Amino acid sequence: MIEYTLTTNFVEVTVLPIYIEEQSIPYENCYVWMYNVKIKNKSQSTIQLLSRHWQIIDYKGKVNEIAGVGVIGEQPVIKSGEVFKYTSGTYLNVPSGIMQGKYEFLNEESIKVFEVMIPPFSLDSPYIKTRPH
C-alpha cells in the first residue's frame, strides 16, 4: 500500500487508499475503495475544515466531482501541531482511477479562508493488467 502526502499552506494531508475486495463485484463493474486521511496542522494557528471538493477520474477519463460541507459530517477544529484522521470510501465502474481534490479551511486567528490541496492518489484494483497511475 502506498501513502500519498502533500503539504499546502502549512497543512499536511496524507491519504492511504485501500481496495476492498469483499465489497467489490467486478463482474458487475463495481470496484470499491476506502481511504484513510490524516490532516496535520503544521501552522501556528488553530484552523477549521469548512468544506471539501473531490475529483474522481476513472482510467477512461470520466470525471465525477463531489463537493460538500466538512468531512464525514464534521467540520473539525485542528489546533497547531494536532492531527485529525478520518476514513471514507468511493467506488468506480472500472478497475482503476485517480482521486484528487482540496479542502477549504478557516484560520481562526486571522479569520481568513484558505485552500489545502489533497494529493492525487491512485485507485488501483487487482483487475488491471498494468498499473496505469
UniProtKB/Swiss-Prot annotation:
One GO term of the biological process aspect: error-free translesion synthesis
Coiled coil: none
Sequence ranges assigned to domain ApaG in this UniProt record: 5-130
Highest taxon, organism lineage: Bacteria
Pfam families: DUF525
The name this protein goes by in its record: Protein ApaG
Source organism (scientific name): Wolbachia sp. subsp. Drosophila simulans (strain wRi)
Lineage: Bacteria, Pseudomonadati, Pseudomonadota, Alphaproteobacteria, Rickettsiales
